[in-house]
Amino acid sequence: MRVLGIETSCDETGIAVYDDEKGLLSHALYSQVKLHADYGGVVPELASRDHVRKIIPLIRQALKEANCTQDDIDAIAYTKGPGLVGALLVGACVGRSLAFAWGKPAVGVHHMEGHLLAPMLEEDVPEFPFLALLVSGGHSMMVAVEGIGRYQVLGESVDDAAGEAFDKTAKLMGLDYPGGPRLAKLAAQGEPNCYRFPRPMTDRPGLDFSFSGLKTFAANTIADEPDDEQTRANIARAFEEAVVDTLAIKCKRALKQTGYNRLVIAGGVSANSRLRESLAEMMQGLGGRVYYPRGEFCTDNGAMIAYAGMQRLKADQLEPLAVKGMPRWPLDSLPPV
């Protein structure tokens, strides 16, 4: 089976062609970072319009790079949600239209299931069951994964997601958009133990996250301290360490609760090197293993949508003809495969 994957949930237009025997045949991505930089964040209307401009050229590019035509495509998978409703509708409309015109089946994919399954694109893949930490700009959640579609959300953010906290704190520090990677780069220049930030919700039972208070703590620290480069780097490091420690503490707690010894990290924040190092060290100490996608598949992309969609298509979980985007869509509401 050969699937065309379409991702348009936020500010990246991602197109990919995935073959169940040959693997990933092509992967085309356009990022809107420059478009939104002047606004310090994603502007939904601008994001939707840019998806409209870029999606067809990227589909042509992906098909060309995969050395195939529409006749070689067996099915189409597109991101149905969650995400920005206008952006979702662009991908859904194009995906459904191509499916109708080409006479192919189509399926709407859950964006976070795409992230969760992104490590399956690598050569070394995790076996079920495993614990998944999904951390991005819009979501932070801990999921027990027994199989595809067999998900139990153990904890999630009650306010700001981890990636959102990174971006907002970076903005408070005067860093350009996208703030998360820039804050991490600044933190690498910081000295340890200069500031002690709280580790939110780690002093109580449960696996939920809260990062809004940490962001406020960072804002107060920034306001009270000198505005020189080294001080800013030290604050950035303290903030990053607090987020990473919080995530690691929650992961360790969840692993003990589930009895699993395999951990998957996915989503945009999974590209953070300090987080990867911390969780790898933790899992080594626990006698387990950690898995994550390569850097280009940490952020939104069409490859993960093509792969996740293929699993649904093989189970004959097809979509009706109606075009629908779902800005809110609980991960654990998905049917098993």
Curated annotation (Swiss-Prot):
Binding annotation for Fe cation: H111, H115, D300
Coiled-coil residue spans: none
Pfam families in alphabetical order: TsaD
Catalytic reactions of this protein: L-threonylcarbamoyladenylate + adenosine(37) in tRNA = N(6)-L-threonylcarbamoyladenosine(37) in tRNA + AMP + H(+)
Cofactor(s) this protein requires: Fe(2+)
Disulfide bonds: none
Chief localization: cytoplasm
Cofactor detail note: Binds 1 Fe(2+) ion per subunit.
Catalytic activity, EC: 2.3.1.234
Binding site for substrate: L134, V135, S136, G137, G138, D167, G180, N272
Biological process according to GO: tRNA threonylcarbamoyladenosine modification
Subcellular compartments: Cytoplasm
Keywords: Acyltransferase, Cytoplasm, Iron, Metal-binding, Transferase, tRNA processing
Enzyme class name: transferase
Entry's Gene Ontology cellular component terms: cytoplasm
InterPro entries: ATPase_NBD, Gcp-like_dom, KAE1/TsaD, Peptidase_M22_CS, TsaD
Protein family (similarity comment): Belongs to the KAE1 / TsaD family.
Function noted in UniProt: Required for the formation of a threonylcarbamoyl group on adenosine at position 37 (t(6)A37) in tRNAs that read codons beginning with adenine. Is involved in the transfer of the threonylcarbamoyl moiety of threonylcarbamoyl-AMP (TC-AMP) to the N6 group of A37, together with TsaE and TsaB. TsaD likely plays a direct catalytic role in this reaction.
The protein's name: tRNA N6-adenosine threonylcarbamoyltransferase
